[in-house]
Amino acid sequence: MRAQEKKIKEFIGGLDKVFIIPPFQRHYVWDEKNCLELWDDLINSMNTSVAHYLGNIIYYPSKESGAAYTELILVDGQQRLTTILLILAAIRDTTTDENLKNDINNKYLKNDVRNEKYRIRLKAGLEDNESFENIIDGNLDSLNDSNLFTNYNLFLAKLTTSNINHQKLFDAIANCDIVDINLQPDDNLLLVQTVFEKINSTGKELTAGDLIRNLLLTSNSVEIQNIFYSEYWVKIEDNIGVDKIPEFIYDYLLIKLSPHRFKKTDVYDRFKECLKNKDLSKKEVLAELLMYSKHYKYLVEKEICPNEKIAKNIREIIMLKATDLNALLLLLFNEMYQRQETELEKIVSLLADFILRYRFVKDYSGGDALQSVVGQIINKLIKEEITYNYNDILFELSNS
């Protein structure tokens, strides 16, 4: 790891770098309040000639960097860096000083190369990149109502409705102080993830789903990150919904770590241990999660199961708030759906009847007793002590 104090103009400027916002990072989320706070800080710096401190910018080099250009994958500071570039684009688009316009465009926003991969100095996240490139290229007719465009327009309005000296504002931005932190992890990507966890622990709290996504998508290859994101993670989120990721991973782990149980608040730590102890590749885990998510969507009603009998009983289980059954249902769906569908119908109906009777004697919290029953059945199925059929499940429930 290497840390250096720098001016932002040294960090962004030059002809040998492209900044990459990886898919494991949040999308661009700065709102008007964030932008106005930065704007006021920059105006104060311009008026007082005191450099504004922008904070740390943490990154690591991609192994796919070319001979002429280095790809720097951002771990922290991407929201601030993106916003600074939006302000620079707004200055470029409102100044009448052609020298300043060209200086900003050619040294801070774009690279003078034919290779499209390196043309724009910042590659925003996959969902933001088109809007960001349109702003940098001046294709304003192509812009939608993205957050990037909203903030760009805010800065345009500030510049066109005031008597701000464009050159002085640019100088204030260029003079901003940062700490440039190059993680230099080589192949030790655990360092990247550890730093990510620590720097984000002081900001907006990340969900277990955020942390797991970051863990699975972190790579020293931008190409692999994008493949993992678009071919696996996005599809998982589409199947079950972003807000359901933590409980989905929890139920997945109840299967993978059976018979061990753990608190839902420990899901990220248990996931890291599972990835390490079972010696699974990230691609293998993503593929398995995608497979399970195709069934889990029925359990959270993101999509109604095409089998009407199963769908009816799933609705009853959901109505009874029996989420403790989800891990067992997920395992049953994964092993039986489309192969033993008639038998699965019978078992899901059995579970719906069981939980209804269970609610007559227990409250809706489920509790350790129900979790224990479910855990024992999962464990016996995995160990092949019982089979995936109605009679075996009935016997286990009857003797619980």
Where are these predicted regions, by residue range?
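A cross-family structural signal marking well-folded subdomains
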Residues: 178, 184, 205-400
